[in-house]
């Protein structure tokens, strides 16, 4: 049995320490007020039983809470008071040096919580440790100086989650859609070096990856680019090769007609496309940003984003190459082809590619094969997105969607001073998200004690708390100068503001968004209605709650001219934090708080049996009410030999839901070469670990495991809460 120390280190549980602590408190009171030795040992025994009955390692604070409860039960209040006083004094000492232990445990790789905090960061690497160290300082400053005390307390108690406090000390936003078109066509500056318009497709791809790395180092969330911004440079290369081929053959004394020159030039174009796409794939996963990780980058593949004709065919060529290279994968250190985490790919299902007789159906077949093998691409339905948002555009990274462009419609104009702005078109690239605060809906429900009137009252109070926390995020960005991140604010990724100019205008009028996240809709409904939200009564209640969240955002938006938007929070590591806080506040409630995770956003519970099509149809009603971003998924077995089934799901997505993905497994054991599913098992301490079913290997450094984690693919393992959630996922097909 393990415990988690305050520093984050994982240690073996030692009941004797409880006995020693209680004896110390016992000695400080008069003889007639003391516990008997039997009572002291009974306290240790009772606490040990509770700890062993939990399916996770408890923190020191949680164990001390249990000791306090047991002391109070004995009726020996003086002993309990001495124990509580001693604990309080120790807490004051620790607060004098709030970050020391955390940082030291990071450096020595002893911090178990940090090891599993981010499934795409390796905490043993120096650059990651530096980022985490800076993050600890930022969190400390945020906690002590930058946020109101009640918001800090609500965050620490798991009532809300103030996302990314490890970056809040700086004036940084969350995620964005990169205006790569402006940067490439009109030039940019990277690291104080002028970058002019590229003269080939491969050069454009190289510039794009350099820009991606710079952007990632100046924000903390994901970013997205679209291939349609790169594709004009395919024809630039084509024109160059036509001239080169003609010159080369003329110099060699070989006569060639125009048709033959075209054929040879086209062969060179295809090779250049292959090289350019390879640059994107390998640069993205090998570049290291100041965040200590590869950039969280999404590549958008949408044929209808360019006009019909040569340029659309060129875009199809680039998409085909992107899918082929992703299907192949990348080699790990052993030289084995594996699934990379990035870039995330999004493929738009549209009229020209979804039907078997459509012109680009071959790309859809290729996308299906790629998904079956490598978990990507994910899918956006052009038909549904046009109906719901009026335009088709990518999410910013994983799932955060911009609100439809209203600033152009309202005549606000080119406030970003972009060189490619068109007042007759809606603008999405060059826009961003200011940040996220998430409400824990399960806590709202449990706090109401099943009284519906109290539920709605508490929800109103918590929403106002979230509103104030979101305003803190917004106010932190107000007054930010463009000099803080020239690649973003001055050189085209977001804007082309002058040096020393404030970014304030970009925070209003719908140019950027700010997100009210939510989590635990399933558990909330389960507690209030004793039923899943897939039941008729449960669904009605859950939808009312979603409508309430949207009403709040719309009210704030109208009053402040800031685009608040409801967001289906992915909760990578926070799912574990929320579950621990719920267990501490409300105990173990069957089906509600008895797991080490809570369900992301509106999702059907991972253990609930439901077929893929019913799940997507059901969740589509909730996705509409998450305009700030959400994604649905279906869990499927190995589909490499059943691509037709994948295509049938894709076609269902096209007709029924805006944004969805398929989850499968992609693993490799470096000890025995096993490439089936690596399993999750309990070790001797009851901890969930990964094990090769073929050879029994449990060394995470000697296996490659890829699982979908909240929209992205995770490859660096997960905390105990998320690991339990992965283990409990049922197949939907």
Where are these regions (language model features)?
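Contiguous, well-ordered alpha-helical segments that form the cores/surfaces of helical PPI scaffolds
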Residues: 514-527, 547, 708
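Long insertion/accessory domains within large nucleic-acid-processing enzymes
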Residues: 694-733
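Charged, amphipathic alpha-helical regulatory modules used
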Residues: 1-110, 727-732
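Metallocofactor- and cofactor-centric catalytic cores in central/energy metabolism, strongly enriched
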Residues: 273-277, 281, 526-527, 722-728
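Amphipathic, well-packed alpha-helical segments that form the structural scaffold of globular domains
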Residues: 23, 467, 471, 522-526
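Conserved catalytic cores of very large enzyme subunits
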Residues: 89-93, 99-510, 531, 535-698, ...
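Conformational switch/transducer regions in large eukaryotic molecular machines and scaffolds
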Residues: 14, 681, 711-712
């Amino acid at each position: 049995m393990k415990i988690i120390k305050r520093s984050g280190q994982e240690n073996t549980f030692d009941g004797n320490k409880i006995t020693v602590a209680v004896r110390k408190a016992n000695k400080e009171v008069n003889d007639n007020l003391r516990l008997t030795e039997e009572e002291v040992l009974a306290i240790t025994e009772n606490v040990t039983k509770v700890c062993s009955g939990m399916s996770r390692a408890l923190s020191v604070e949680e164990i001390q809470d249990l000791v306090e409860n047991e002391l109070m039960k004995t009726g020996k209040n003086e002993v309990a008071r001495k124990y509580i006083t001693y604990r309080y004094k120790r807490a004051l000492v620790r607060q004098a040096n709030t970050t020391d232990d955390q940082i030291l445990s990071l450096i020595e790789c002893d911090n178990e919580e940090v090891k599993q905090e981010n499934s795409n960061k390796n905490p043993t690497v120096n650059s990651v440790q530096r980022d985490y160290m800076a993050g600890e300082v930022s969190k400390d400053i945020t906690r002590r100086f930058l946020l109101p005390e009640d918001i800090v307390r609500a965050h620490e108690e798991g009532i809300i989650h103030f996302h990314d406090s490890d970056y809040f000390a700086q004036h940084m936003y969350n995620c964005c859609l990169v205006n790569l078109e402006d940067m490439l066509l009109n030039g940019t500056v990277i690291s104080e070096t002028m970058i002019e318009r590229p003269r080939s497709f491969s050069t454009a791809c190289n510039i794009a990856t350099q820009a991606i790395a710079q952007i990632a180092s100046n924000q903390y969330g994901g970013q997205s680019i679209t291939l349609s911004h790169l594709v004009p440079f395919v024809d630039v290369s084509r024109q160059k090769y036509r001239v080169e081929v003609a010159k080369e053959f003329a110099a060699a004394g070989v006569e060639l007609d125009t048709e033959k020159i075209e054929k040879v030039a086209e062969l060179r174009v295809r090779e250049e496309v292959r090289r350019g796409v390879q640059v994107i794939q390998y640069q993205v996963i090998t570049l290291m940003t100041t965040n200590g990780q590869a950039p969280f980058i999404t590549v958008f593949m949408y044929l209808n984003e360019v006009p019909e004709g040569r340029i659309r065919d060129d875009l199809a060529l680039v998409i085909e190459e992107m899918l082929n290279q992703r299907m192949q994968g990348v080699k790990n250190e052993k030289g084995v082809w594996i699934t990379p985490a990035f870039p995330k790919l999004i493929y738009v299902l549209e009229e020209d590619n979804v039907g078997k007789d459509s012109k680009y159906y071959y790309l859809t077949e290729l996308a299906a094969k790629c998904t079956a093998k490598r978990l990507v691409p994910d899918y956006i339905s052009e038909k549904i997105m046009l109906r719901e948002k009026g335009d088709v555009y990518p999410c910013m990274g994983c799932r955060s969607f911009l609100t439809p462009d209203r600033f152009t419609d309202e005549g606000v104009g080119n406030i970003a001073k972009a060189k490619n702005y068109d007042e007759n078109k809606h603008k999405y690239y060059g826009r961003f998200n200011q940040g996220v605060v998430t409400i824990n809906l399960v806590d709202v429900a449990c706090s109401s004690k099943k009284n519906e009137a109290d539920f709605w009252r508490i929800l109103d109070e918590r929403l106002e708390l979230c509103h104030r926390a979101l305003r803190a995020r917004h106010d932190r960005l107000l007054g930010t100068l463009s000099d803080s991140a020239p690649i973003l604010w001055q050189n085209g990724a977001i804007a082309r503001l002058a040096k020393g100019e404030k970014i304030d205008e970009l925070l209003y009028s719908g140019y950027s968004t700010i997100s009210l996240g939510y989590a635990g809709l399933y558990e909330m409904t389960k507690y209030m209605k004793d039923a899943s939200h897939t039941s008729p009564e449960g669904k009605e209640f859950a939808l009312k709650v979603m409508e309430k969240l949207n009403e709040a955002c719309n009210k704030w938006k109208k009053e402040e001219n800031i685009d608040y938007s409801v967001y289906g929070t992915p909760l990578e590591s926070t799912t574990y934090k929320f579950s621990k806080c719920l267990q501490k506040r409300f105990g173990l409630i069957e089906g509600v708080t008895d797991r080490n995770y809570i369900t992301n956003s509106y999702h059907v519970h991972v253990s609930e049996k439901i077929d893929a099509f019913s799940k997507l149809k059901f969740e589509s009603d909730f996705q509409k009410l998450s305009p700030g971003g959400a994604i649905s998924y279906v869990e499927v077995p190995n589909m490499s030999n059943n691509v037709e089934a994948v295509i049938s799901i894709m076609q269902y997505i096209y007709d029924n839901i805006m944004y969805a993905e398929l989850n499968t497994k992609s693993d490799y054991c470096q000890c025995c070469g096993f490439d089936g599913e690596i399993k999750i098992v309990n070790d001797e301490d009851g901890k969930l670990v990964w094990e090769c079913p073929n050879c029994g290997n449990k060394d995470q450094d000697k296996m490659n495991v890829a699982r979908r984690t909240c929209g992205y693919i995770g490859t660096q393992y997960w905390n105990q809460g998320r690991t339990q959630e992965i283990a409990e996922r049922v197949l939907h097909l």
